Amino acid sequence: MTYLDLRKAFHDPAQDADQLYDRRFNDERTWHLKTSIAGSPAFVYMAPEIYEALLEAAQIDKDILRLEAALPQRALDSYRDSCLIDEIVLTNEIEGVHSTRREIGEVLERLKQNDRRGRFFGIVQKYALLQTRPDIALRTCADVRDVYDDLVLAEVRISDPHNVPDGTYFRTKMVHVINEAGIPIHDGIEPEARIIEEMDQALDVLNDESREPLLRIALFHFLFGYIHPFYDGNGRTNRFISSYLISRQYEPIVGLGISYAVKQEIEKYYKAFSRCEHPLNRGDITPFVIAFSEICVNAMCNLRDALTEKKSQMDMYLHRSAVLVPEPLRTLVESLITATLFTFDGVTAKELCEAERLSRQTLYKRLSELRKLGFLQEEKIGRKVFYKLNEEAFLLRGC
């Protein structure tokens, strides 16, 4: 049964909106927050949809762990990098910031060499850390500002210096939130003293360990968006914090699928915000908690399905390799299969030499043999040549 928001109940002659509000607000399971939304005390009613999302997330997380354990480490590492790149491109895209997979991929490669140059270094570094389950402090306004500074401040300063935060931690002036069509949908809280007060309360919600983690993450995500503490970079900061928290609660790779899932359901995402901010909804944040929890579960489903498909493809390719490829070339073909299924561009000669522990001369000799068999796909991108398995030829060749 779809959760009926109070605004709709108010306009429905068949509903008693006051009675529905009283029942939810006074339910013993309801979580009352120390803040208000559009002038009404904020609360979350523990609807069945929330419990269903929590249970489903726990089950899918186990499925993802099982699939990860069944994949070679090289394949998993490559796929994590690919997910990380996609996540950053999409979180930028949602905010109207243009970036490409290649651009983010190059920053990631430089990061692995301890090279801090380049645009988007901060956001790439932050997301790359998620796979190690770092402990990022999120207890004070200063902590939130530190995340913002590391993540997007440099990019905001380049884009428009006037959007750099001008208060102790946050902005000091009014800001209007607009949707993708450029229509104002929300005014952020002001002045900074109130932003600080509201953010402190939101952080208290986030750190209340008596509550389910996904519930707290969803609530904080809403409250951060409602407060809108910065002039620019709010969405990217908010989604990163959610990704970080989810990567701590579930398998780390799950945190790299949040922006993709939000982008897939962007209308549902924004509509959930607007429903809860409406005065007639009377402070009930439950619709957003349900929507955001479902979006997170969908992110986990997407990941599970992708890993399942890639595991199936890899098993099939390895089986064909055992029949079609001469034994001395099989480990090289396995590396090419991994690059084909789990990366975007493929793999370079340098990476193949390191993975296979081969000299350049031996590698090129074996690549030449695969080329003669028709199993090698090559593409020059910039100065580098990337290699993949020629899937069409490999699949058409009779066993």
Language-model-detected regions and their locations in the chain:
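FIC/Doc superfamily catalytic core
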Residues: 1-399
